[in-house]
Amino acid sequence: EPLSIHLLADVDAYEQIVENAIGNKSPDKEEIFRFKWHGLFFLTPMKEAFMSRLRIPGGVLKSYQLRELAHIAQQITSGYVQVTTRANLQMRLIRPKDAPEFLHRIQAIGLHTRGSGADNIRNLTMNPTAGVDPVELIDVQPFVQQIAQVIINDRSFYDLPRKFNIAYDGGGLIGSVEDTNDIGVKAVKVGDEILFRIALGGATGHK
């Protein structure tokens, strides 16, 4: 089914982000909404700057990514990084003129901001000790990383009726609270087999 013009305009708002940067122009009301698809949230009236939410699938980062994020924070944002409940990272006080550079540098280290806000599938979470838990049934990191790439690159997963959460749990000592997500996937042992139990319709916060 063809995508709506509305969705295409939101996902393809990058050109407008670049145009606004030339004059350090704050986004108008419509652009504020559209730029959320690129993970940029305008902080007005508090500040004439953006907050950006990064997608960190499973909350896993490489050391070189952390180093570059520290440089970005010091050079073109507020100087600090926030961690969210879904293992995202948030960076604040990005001026409109710095937004394109910010996005370029984030993508250059293999990270993304697209779809981290608005009505899209949010960051995938998993148990924090995945891959190192001595009693886990299965390491769910490969599943989380693969599905995250599919979501980022498939436009049919954007512009949903509401934001959508997915979590994986490998059945180890520390859980991912997967049952509070719209889709929760947990490894379970049935006899000699390791299977996935899928729970649907979980929620946190508002109803």
Set out the residue ranges of the language-model regions:
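Small-residue-enriched alpha-helical segments and adjacent helix-cap loops
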Residues: 8, 16-29, 44, 49-195
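FAD-binding subdomain of flavoenzyme oxidoreductases
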Residues: 198-202
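Internal alpha/beta scaffold segment
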Residues: 204-207
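Short, compositionally biased "basic patch" segments
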Residues: 32-33
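Intrinsically disordered, low-structural-confidence terminal and linker regions
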Residues: 1-9
